[in-house]
Amino acid sequence: MQDQRELGGAAGQGLPLCAFLSDLPEQGGGVSLRQVSKDSGAPGRQSGDAVEWARLRCALPPPDGEARTSGGSCEGLSTSTARGPDPGEHSGAWGEFEVFQESSASSEQFCQSFELQERPAASQPWRTASAQKQHGSSQPHQGGVTGTGAIAASELVVSCEDVFRSAFQEVPVPQATEGISTLDHFLEARNEESSGLESAQKLCSESRKLWRALHNTGTMTISRCTWSESRSRENFLPVLGVDAAQKSLSGSPGRTLGEPGLHEPEELGFHLQRCRALIQTKLSGTPTGGQGSLITYSLFLKTPIHGNGQYITTPRKKKTFGPRNLKLTLFNSDIY
């Protein structure tokens, strides 16, 4: 009772509470807040003294038996004082702080949920990789995005292959190796009856004869009969660039080569009397088919001189080609 009186008198007189705390080393933890509030006489200072005394009481080291009780009471008191402030003080400060704490926590939860929704693909591969490591290789694509992406990629590749196969279908082409003859077979065949292609032989018989005659340039095998037979001459001269239907100077219609006004060949060429024509005068070379062999032919303009029976020869054109080109020229010009 004496301690309570001294404590009540100290609270009524307004003395600082720190002076009494040093005198109460063991009983400080047992003093209650209710006693201080009863003995305090000033109503304006009642709540402030109670709060400060409660804080100082919590700061004191409690006894061993009352450690849990004093701790629980201090925690309850601090929460009660924090949630229930004095009406005389600014009542909006702690309330705003509590509202700010609640709003910050909710905003953090909202940001976390928004980030999870915004980036699902970035977080799930790591989860799937760890899950695959835990579950092993027996379940490689179970419950993950990487497995689904791999399956979708493989399906995409297969679909592209199907599109290309449907667009570019494979058509089997049989290999036709029978019944194909080369150009040399037509132009250089010795036995016309043994080839087996009678229609082709009939078309290429004259060309074959002319080719053989050109092949043997060492002898005078190009006779007027061979040169004038069928249409070989008429087709072969335009191929070489010879115009065989030139008009005469007098305006009379020109006579083609091989008509009665034609003289005998002179140096493997022809000349006409009383007309002007481009004629072939020389065909040299060894068309044996070997590499490096060339055939050269020269074209001259021969103009007859009136009354003398002589001609003025003017060179016009000279061309050199290989035997292979001559074969193609003869065959493609439909010479028969």
From Swiss-Prot:
Matching Pfam families: Clathrin_bdg
Any GO BP: intracellular transport
Region annotated Disordered, chain positions: 29-93, 116-147
UniProt-listed InterPro entries: Aftin-like, Clathrin-bd
GO cellular component: AP-1 adaptor complex; trans-Golgi network membrane
GO molecular function, one term: clathrin binding
Biased composition (Polar residues): 70-82, 125-141
Matches recorded under PANTHER family: AFTIPHILIN A-RELATED, CLATHRIN BINDING BOX OF AFTIPHILIN CONTAINING 1
Name the UniProt record assigns to this protein: Uncharacterized protein CLBA1
Species whose genome carries this gene: Bos taurus
